[in-house]
Amino acid sequence: MKKYGSYKPTGVSWIPYIPTGWNMVKINDLFIERREKVSDKDYAPLSVTKFGVLPQLETAVKTKDGENRKKVCAGDFVINSRSDRRGSSGISPLDGSVSLINIVLQPRKGTSYYFHYLLRSHTFIEEFYRNGRGIVADLWTTRYSEMKNILVPVPSYEEQLAIVEYLNWKSAAFNHIIP
């Protein structure tokens, strides 16, 4: 992708400049937290990993309380709040359910995979972590009440699609190099 012609300051430390024409928007203005509780008997269990949101393996350890899970709809962005620093998050391609430690974000409007890339980026993960709390890194968590005010860069929908197309192309090229 080409560099943009001009940039403007954001006033935000994790991303100090964005292209002119983009906006900085609070996560709360883009997503609503989905907190609906469901059963894993009605909604297939999903795992949130560094590879994204996937069907849970049959061999995965399950809680005894399968009734106490959060609903996930295809298109929701899900963050594993216990593995957020490892990038365990992504847009779910499936309807299903996740454990209560996950943050499920329902897009307010149609969203693109731009947010899948943005919210999994190293700089965002560090900002997400900075807004959390805990006694040690392994027991650190960021709640939606803390993350909802994080400002993120939002280009036009057309630019989002172009960015996703470019990143998909680069990822595919990289995946051919490393099997």
Features from the language model and the residues they span:
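Conserved hydrophobic/aromatic beta-strand scaffold that supports enzyme active sites
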Residues: 45, 104, 149-151
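A short beta-sheet element
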Residues: 69, 74-132, 136, 143-147
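Interdomain signal-transducing alpha-helices
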Residues: 115, 160-163
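Non-catalytic DNA-recognition/assembly elements of restriction-modification systems
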Residues: 6-38, 149, 154-157, 161, ...
